[in-house]
Amino acid sequence: MKRIIPILMTLLLLSGCATQSAEKTYRQITMEEAITMMEKETGYIILDVRTAQEYSEKHIPGAINIANESIGTEDITELPDKDQLILVYCRSGNRSKQASEKLVKLGYTNIIEIGGINSWPGETVTGDK
């Protein structure tokens, strides 16, 4: 018994000191939570990952358009600050999840996926900008 206690204490100590690699990921919030965040925060980017045609038909004011299909393995010049808060959306939420995963793999650290514009309760605009 005297031998087991020091061994258990050592294992406990070592397991507490072990560093666990935090899995890099993105957060998901609702559109309503996104609106509240946009009212409080500054310096964020709203990223629409739909096609250019979908973007021109209707998008969130101030959003920039980078199609999900164009997000790959290279840095994105329109998003130079990898620590900047980026709110990502698409039409229904599927492409925004894919794009968020790709952005995290590219080293972006502050990605929030907000779903699809179909659920957006706020104002939308048309055109290329």
Report residues per predicted region.
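Residue-level signal for mature regions of secreted extracellular proteins and peptides
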Residues: 10-11
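Structural scaffold elements adjacent to functional motifs in cytosolic proteins
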Residues: 45-48
